[in-house]
């Protein structure tokens, strides 16, 4: 809660400021819960301060976790400010320890990369002022209907790959034969629909 203990999870219903720690959420992948819990416990033990939206003081801002359904690759991105005096210790040492904790987790998926993004924007958005790769790579792969996509942490891509496959397959059935036809991919985000039809 606002001005309360360190929390990591979702916004409290009806509140822009309050965050509620979500443990064992039934609608997300269990790997997400393990990663969230590990990061939260690590920074609670360090005494790190979260970024206060009104005073603009603090270190921890967001935790971005993405996982591919088909490849099971996971990308983790810790988003902080550059206010390292609030991280509870030596930032470089802490980040190395956090990477070690995350890499030692027993997960169903495989961690493709662990990133650290700095964001000093006053807005409550996950903005990329600078990103360091702490481990692995700064992307992961997902597959849709036989095509392989390289996904970066801030790219728009369907979060429900299985649902996207059903949607795209349905769209493909409506369009019919596309051989020797030109397809204009207008207003469709990353262009996955046109790639499926090509």
Model-derived segments and spans:
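Accessory RNA-recognition modules of RNA-modification enzymes
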Residues: 1-198
């Amino acid at each position: 809660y606002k001005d309360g203990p360190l929390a990591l999870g979702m916004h409290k219903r009806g509140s822009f400021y309050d965050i509620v720690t979500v443990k064992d959420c039934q609608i997300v992948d269990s790997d997400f819960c393990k990663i969230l819990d590990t990061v939260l416990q690590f920074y609670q033990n360090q005494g790190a301060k979260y970024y206060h939206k009104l005073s603009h003081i603090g270190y921890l801002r967001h935790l971005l976790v993405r996982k591919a359904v088909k490849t099971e690759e996971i990308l983790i991105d810790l988003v902080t400010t550059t206010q390292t005096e609030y991280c509870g210790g030596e930032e470089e040492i802490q980040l190395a320890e956090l990477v070690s904790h995350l890499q030692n987790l027993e997960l169903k998926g495989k961690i493709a990369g662990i990133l650290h993004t700095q964001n000093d924007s006053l807005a409550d958005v996950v903005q990329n002022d600078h990103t360091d790769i702490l481990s692995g790579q700064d992307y992961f792969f997902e597959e849709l209907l036989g095509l392989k996509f390289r996904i970066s942490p801030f790219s728009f891509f369907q979060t429900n790959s299985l649902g996207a496959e059903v949607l795209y397959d349905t769209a493909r059935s409506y369009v019919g034969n596309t051989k020797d036809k030109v397809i204009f991919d207008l207003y469709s985000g990353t262009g996955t629909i046109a790639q499926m039809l090509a």
